[in-house]
Design a protein with these regions (language model features):
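A structural signal for the hydrophobic beta-strands that form the central parallel beta-sheet
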Residues: 32-33, 63, 142
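Boundary at the C-terminal end of the N-terminal hydrophobic targeting segment
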Residues: 17-21
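Bacterial N-terminal signal peptides
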Residues: 7-16
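General helical structural elements
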Residues: 6-7, 374
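Catalytic nucleophile-elbow at a beta strand-turn-alpha helix junction centered on a G-D-S/GDSL motif
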Residues: 28-42, 67-70, 99
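Residues that line or immediately flank small-molecule/substrate-binding pockets and catalytic motifs
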Residues: 8, 34, 94
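Positively charged n-region of N-terminal signal peptides that target proteins for export
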Residues: 1-4
Length: 455
């Protein structure tokens, strides 16, 4: 924790040079503009979950990521994919595809020149993106890139040399934030530090580029921290005699005695469930080793002081949560770890966040395919003419050699377009429903707490 605090202080100094990141306001529309890391959208869904579970109501976290995207490529779609959607703020996350990681394998004169050229192109494109957003009355927010996981203990044959390129990108982003007086979100230093400290615990996949589930939750947590959302779910102290102290929860109907306390507990926030399994695998199993999520975001403390010595039954409504000593209650118990009525809601909210992620990432494949044929070389079909777009995509795919290394991937992308495009309107409706359900499920319920000495 000490090393983490030092890193936080050093990075905070860099952030001071840019504008302070403003909290997300109720009803705010925020769009995330980036590459495949954003296209997948898990960190966006997790961030939406954190906002909803903390009562920041009516927000809309929108996905404008495209697999293989770059800052230069972003310029070609910014008008229809970003500005036309009328967000209040746009969080910009490019860099991974801009540097050309194969250029870092050796320090040949040609590679050194190519690195320089690519970074200059990236800088120029980012400046144009910033200018276009400002001209449209939209606030740009810059994000340093995620880390390149060249430290993981894996025998995968992939380039393990790209971190200097991403560090250069991070420096460019910081410089632009300072020059333009823009808000800045730092991902790169924190995630790089985690990877270096825990090479045995993968934060990214075997391609060393794309964060896995736990990496996306770390991204969301860093976003939450830097937009002012860190802190407990609740922190409540109830003395048997004296004044109640409470953060993020209301206490009503309080009745106290030396061996019995009862009250109505009305929390404002909901803990984030970390127990979810995908294909029977605990996807957040190693989270606390990498990032102190519970301490920073998930603690829900209830203290009861002044009780007579002994053991006490703690109940939520009529359900017993456990037996605790007076000393334990005096120090504080963590309601977020107990089977309160909100435990089930927390589990459901994470499932709803997962549904929101699926609903928000699926339409991005349609945008991706339309961009593949945007040059007009394969015709200029209307976006809504799904059959004509599919035929143009077939021509585009046929233009690539059979041994093209990305043929299998793009064949799947094109086939998915043909399958999903006719349901585009239904997909958009599903996304709206998924967002509403997540907001509903992420709200806590109130319940009666009874603490009584056991006989």
């Amino acid at each position: 924790m000490k090393k983490w605090s030092i890193l936080l202080m050093l990075t905070a100094f860099a952030v001071i040079l840019s504008a302070a990141v403003q909290p997300v306001k109720p009803g705010e529309k925020v769009l995330f503009f980036g590459d495949s890391i954003t296209h997948g959208g898990r960190y966006i869904a997790f961030f939406q979950l954190i906002l909803d579970s903390r009562g920041i109501t009516g927000t809309d976290m929108m996905n404008a990521g495209i697999s293989g995207g770059s800052a230069t490529g972003g310029l070609r779609r910014i008008q229809h994919d970003v500005i036309a959607r009328k967000p209040d703020r746009v969080f910009i996350l490019f860099g991974m595809n801009d540097v050309g990681r194969w250029r870092y394998k050796t320090d040949s004169p040609q590679n050194l020149q190519n690195r320089k050229n690519r970074l200059e192109t990236y800088t120029a494109s980012q400046k144009k993106i910033i200018a276009m957003l400002k001209a449209a009355g939209i606030t740009p927010v810059l994000m340093t890139p995620t880390a390149y996981d060249q430290y993981q203990k894996d025998e995968t044959d992939n380039l393990r040399c790209n971190e200097p390129g991403l560090s250069d990108v991070a420096d460019i982003v910081r410089k632009l934030a300072k020059e333009e007086n823009l808000e800045l979100i730092e991902l790169h230093p924190y995630m790089t530090d985690m990877l270096k400290k825990h090479p045995d615990l993968q934060l990214c996949g075997k391609d060393l580029v794309h964060p896995i589930h736990v990496g996306h939750l770390v991204m969301a947590a860093l976003l939450a921290e830097q937009t002012g959302l860190a802190g407990p779910v609740a922190d409540v102290t109830i003395p048997v005699s004296g004044k109640v102290q409470s953060r993020f929860a209301a206490i009503s109907g309080l009745k106290t005695a030396p061996d019995r306390v009862q009250f109505r507990y009305e929390p404002e926030r909901l803990a984030v469930d970390l127990s979810i399994k995908i294909y029977n695998v605990e996807i957040f199993k190693n989270l606390e080793t990498i990032y102190p999520f519970h301490e920073k975001m998930n603690r829900e403390t209830l203290r009861v002081t002044g009780l007579a010595d002994g053991n006490y039954s703690v109940k939520a409504d009529d359900k017993e949560l456990g037996i605790f000593s007076a000393a334990q209650l005096n120090s504080g118990i963590d309601l977020g770890k107990l089977e309160t009525p909100n435990r089930a809601r927390s589990i459901q909210a994470m499932k709803s966040a997962w549904a929101f992620y699926n609903a928000s990432s699926k339409p991005r494949g349609l945008v991706q395919c339309r961009l593949l044929i945007a040059s007009g070389k394969y015709g200029t079909p209307a976006p809504g003419d799904h059959q004509a777009v599919g035929e143009a995509l077939d021509k585009w795919l046929a233009d690539h050699k059979p041994d093209w290394p990305y043929r299998k991937y793009y064949t799947t992308v094109v086939n998915n377009y043909k399958k999903n495009a006719p349901q585009e309107a239904a997909m958009e409706a599903d996304l709206i429903r998924a967002g509403k359900k997540l907001q509903e499920d992420a709200r806590p319920v109130s319940y009666t707490v009874t603490i009584e000495k056991t006989r």
